[in-house]
Amino acid sequence: MRLKKIRNYLDKQGWKYSYTEEEGLGSIDFEHRGLSYHIWDFEDGGYGAETNVRTVGRQEDILGDYEEEIIEILKTW
């Protein structure tokens, strides 16, 4: 199971989400205040995540400690 820290955060907030895993990589889709969000982790010489949590209309890649960075963004909501 991937994206465990993010899934734990979403569970604590009581936010419903769908989680899928393919080829060992995780994907989370959820809605918040009527907007759809996506977090997809990838491996390309290192792990990262593609997400639209910072700017709902635009995808961005987050590298390094991407789960913590995404959680910090979610905390600002």
Give the positions of each predicted feature.
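Negatively charged, low-complexity tracts enriched in Asp/Glu with abundant Ser/Thr
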Residues: 1-32, 50-68, 72-77
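Short, conserved beta-strand/beta-arch hydrophobic-aromatic motifs that form part
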Residues: 36-53
